[in-house]
Amino acid sequence: MNYQLLWKSAIFSVSSMMAISAVQAAPLNVMTEDYPPFNMQGEGGKIVGLSTEVVEELFKRAGVEYKLTLMPWKRAYEDTLGTPNTALYSTTRTPEREALFKWVGPLVNNNWVFFSSSTANITVKSLEDAKQYSVGGYNGDAAAEYLKAQGFAKLQLAANDTANVKKLEAGRIDLWATGQYLAPYLASKEKVASPKPIFVFKETQMSLAFNKDTPDELITKLNEILAAMKADGTIDKINAKYQ
């Protein structure tokens, strides 16, 4: 019997539980924004969505107590940056954000897509092609930040992505840069024609971002549990509900 291996495993298990106990001095403050179908307000004010289901199952398996709050993205982002015992989802893990947080994920895939209106005749085959058009995004969104960094001079930022549904339909923007699932969802909600996806400009994934003061042992434990959820088919079952 490999007693050294057993001893190391025991130490790791105890360390993991200590990390969870340390966080549980108060419930973990988990924040999210209204970003359907990943995170959104459902009936009775309950926070629901694809990512929410993954997060709830993850914390259930880990035995982590938490409080879930829906708020504007920029406020949630700044709070998670500056306040211990906080986490934020669904957060795109970009090079610019990598060192700002500790990460558990990915939770879900969410490609960034240029959409045109249902009646427009626009062809985009590259980011350079898209620069000639007015493009709608929203403040604080990772996709909008990415396009800014790529030199999109005609980028128009709204307070939220719902505004871009109406702007695209009214012809006030030529393209809408957003997640692959969000555009058709919001169009249906606003009762307008579903926009046309014309170019995937970046393949992305979204994760749980934790304040930097979060114990490494807890991050490791949560990533292990998330990997187990993928291996046992839990993630696939949740995804299937939103297809």
Spans of features found by a protein language model:
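A ligand-binding cleft/hinge motif common to bilobed small-molecule-binding domains
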Residues: 78, 91-100, 174-202
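Periplasmic-binding protein-like
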Residues: 33-34, 110-113, 188-223
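Ligand-binding clefts/hinges and TM-proximal coupling segments of bilobed small-molecule sensing domains
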Residues: 65, 142-159, 227-243
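Sec/Tat signal peptide C-region and signal peptidase I cleavage site
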Residues: 18-27
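Short beta-strand-to-loop elements that line the ligand-binding cleft
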Residues: 65-72, 137, 153-160, 167, ...
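Extracytoplasmic small-molecule ligand-binding "clamshell" domains
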Residues: 26-100, 232
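Extended ligand-binding regions for polar small-molecule ligands
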Residues: 49-61, 208-242
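Flexible hinge/capping segments at coil-to-helix
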Residues: 116-134
